[in-house]
């Protein structure tokens, strides 16, 4: 007979998101969907490295079309999307189709900040950077 006792642990009661900052990660999914207002958007989910499992997946939304949107909101969302593509080393040109499947698996750096939402602190994606390319030079020690 086992004497092992399943019990609650400290981390079951306290939930701290990772510090704001830059994290390496990859894109685990990207797909078109509709916002709660019916606007067409792209939802991108990033898998962050080096964070607790509860915060490993972070979603980012790009609202690209909709009657209730301001021209500025659409412009800013599209500009952020171009920044994301470039951080993934994909360089779209005017007229190219937005292809979410082409983003899946891309590795990049994701900057996150804390945001209060419905009384809880959650992560919000604020920017992206490409991963540094290996220079091919050896580091002298």
Functional labels for PLM-detected ranges:
Residues 1-141:
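Short beta-rich binding modules
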């Amino acid at each position: 007979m086992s004497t092992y006792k399943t019990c609650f642990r400290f981390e079951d009661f306290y939930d701290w998101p990772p510090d704001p900052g830059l994290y390496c990660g990859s894109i685990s999914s990207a797909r078109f969907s509709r916002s709660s207002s019916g606007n067409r958007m792209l939802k991108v989910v990033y898998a962050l490295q080096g964070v607790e499992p509860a915060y490993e997946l972070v979603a980012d939304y790009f609202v690209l079309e909709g009657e209730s949107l301001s021209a500025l909101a659409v412009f800013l969302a599209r500009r952020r999307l171009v920044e994301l593509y470039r951080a993934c080393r994909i360089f779209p040109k005017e007229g190219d189709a937005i292809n979410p499947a082409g983003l899946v698996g891309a590795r990049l750096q994701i900057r996150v900040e804390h945001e209060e939402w419905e009384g809880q602190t959650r992560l919000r994606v604020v920017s992206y950077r490409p991963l540094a390319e290996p220079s091919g030079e050896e580091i002298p020690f």
